[in-house]
């Protein structure tokens, strides 16, 4: 492994609380997935990070975990799978909802299916009978437990290099003064004030604009998203 990258990894491990997340992500992105030595060093770093005292998962660890789990080195894949069989985000639910399937889709970067599954889970959490209605009313949102919204958000945020998730969308919405037109443009759901067509005009990868995913149907109005963004889940989050 080049000494420069090794030194960067060591520095990364020292600065786990650094605010320079972008630089940390770039270091990880530059690691050669076909180089077993580099992957082994990355695996060692991952072990040190997640077994440390007071560990809390973040998007840096999310990218490391994805890099290890999606490598072609079966020894590395087995190591990551055994170390974190349920992923690195605690899958907490007030309704005993199973989030392992969503975690796996996001880890393997199948964002279209992850988005569809997210909508299904929100409908289930709200107690809606999916056989009679497969969308949410704004009155359904308050029925969704805060803990579950936080888990869904953390999964999206952790496995998107910090770009996606409900809380990121909420931050953007607040930053544009709750102006929905500006919000749609900012997150790439509209282009030149024309709503994007589903699914072909949305970006199902990490190259989409910040806040691009998960999707909600803005053609049904803004009340559902407004209810989500003002949910008690984000108080002291």
Swiss-Prot record:
Q: Which SUPFAM superfamilies match?
A: GUN4-like
Q: Which compartments does it reside in? A: Plastid, Chloroplast
Residues spanning the membrane:
none
User: What is the protein name given in its UniProt record?
Assistant: Uncharacterized protein ycf53
List the InterPro entries hit by this protein, alphabetically: GUN4-like (IPR008629), GUN4-like_sf (IPR037215)
Please provide the record's keywords in A-Z order.
Answer: Chloroplast, Plastid
Q: What is its main location?
A: plastid
GO cellular component, as recorded: chloroplast
Q: Which GO terms describe its molecular function?
A: tetrapyrrole binding
Please state the span of the N-terminal signal peptide per the UniProt entry. Answer: none
User: Pfam families from the xrefs?
Assistant: GUN4
Entry similarity comment: Belongs to the ycf53 family.
């Amino acid at each position: 492994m080049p000494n420069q990258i090794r030194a960067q990894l060591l520095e990364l491990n020292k600065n786990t609380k650094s605010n320079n997340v972008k630089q940390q992500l770039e270091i990880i992105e530059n690691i050669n997935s076909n180089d077993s030595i580099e992957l082994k060093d990355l695996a060692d770093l991952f072990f040190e990070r997640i077994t440390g005292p007071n560990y809390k998962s973040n998007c840096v660890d999310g990218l490391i975990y994805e890099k290890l789990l999606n490598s072609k080195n079966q020894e590395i894949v087995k190591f990551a799978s055994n170390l974190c069989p349920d992923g690195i985000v605690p899958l907490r639910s007030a309704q005993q909802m199973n989030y392992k399937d969503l975690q796996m889709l996001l880890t393997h970067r199948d964002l279209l299916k992850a988005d569809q599954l997210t909508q299904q889970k929100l409908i289930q959490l709200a107690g809606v009978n999916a056989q009679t209605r497969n969308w949410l009313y704004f009155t359904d949102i308050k029925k969704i437990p805060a803990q579950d919204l936080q888990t869904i958000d953390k999964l999206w945020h952790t496995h998107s290099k910090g770009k996606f998730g409900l809380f990121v969308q909420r931050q953007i919405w607040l930053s544009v003064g709750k102006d929905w037109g500006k919000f749609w443009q900012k997150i790439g759901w509209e282009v030149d004030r024309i709503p994007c067509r589903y699914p072909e005009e949305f970006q199902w990868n990490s190259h989409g604009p910040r806040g691009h995913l998960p999707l909600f149907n803005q053609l049904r109005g803004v009340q559902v998203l407004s209810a989500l963004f003002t949910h008690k889940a984000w108080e002291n989050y």
